[in-house]
């Protein structure tokens, strides 16, 4: 069985602020589980879009019933690929775990799109949870636990982004006042 988590959210910020915050969201008080973020590649291609690949190391709290399968491993590596189209004010992000994929594979597809009418940035999350674990009953349990954990953490993701966006705007405001 494969589980999907879907969610939408509107940030009351312009597209530029949201995308700057996205690439600067770590560290923040709501993401203490993120240990490191490394930019592997960033380039503007002929189509005028910005392409970025990052590697993220996260710590995780696992339920006791999973530990026999993973041992003492408490972290995971995530690859993140993003494409920003400045003309359409849209960013697409794809994240997936690089390790523990036989136990659980988590793939996150996120679209950020500026809405000219409401002057907000709409975010559409689609997250796929799939396990290749063959032990009877464990596969569905792992997928369900991962799905529920992601759903619980969504609130912290939103708070973390809002925190970083407010800091971005504060920095911009300070720079404008210095120039006056």
Regions from the PLM with identified roles:
Residues 2-8, 66-74, 84-180:
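Terminal "cap-and-tail" regions of soluble proteins that handle hydrophobic small molecules
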Residues 1-62:
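Hydrophobic ligand-binding cavity/cleft-lining segments
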Residues 16-17, 81, 124:
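Generic detector of isolated residues embedded in canonical secondary-structure elements
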């Amino acid at each position: 069985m494969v589980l999907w988590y879907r969610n939408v959210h509107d940030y009351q910020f312009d597209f530029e602020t949201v995308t700057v915050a996205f690439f600067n969201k770590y560290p923040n008080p709501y993401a203490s589980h993120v240990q490191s973020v490394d930019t592997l590649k960033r380039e503007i291609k002929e189509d005028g879009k910005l392409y970025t690949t990052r590697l993220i190391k996260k710590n995780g709290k696992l339920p006791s019933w999973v530990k026999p399968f993973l041992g003492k491993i408490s972290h995971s590596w995530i690859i993140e690929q993003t494409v920003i189209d400045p003309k359409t004010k849209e960013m697409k992000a794809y994240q997936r775990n690089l390790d523990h994929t036989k136990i659980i594979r988590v793939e996150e597809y996120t679209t950020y799109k500026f809405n000219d009418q409401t002057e907000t940035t709409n975010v559409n999350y689609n997250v796929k949870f799939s396990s290749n674990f063959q032990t009877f009953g464990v596969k569905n349990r792992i997928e369900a636990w991962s799905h529920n954990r992601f759903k619980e953490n969504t609130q912290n993701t939103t708070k973390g982004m809002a925190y970083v966006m407010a800091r971005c705007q504060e920095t911009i405001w300070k720079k404008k006042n210095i120039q006056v």
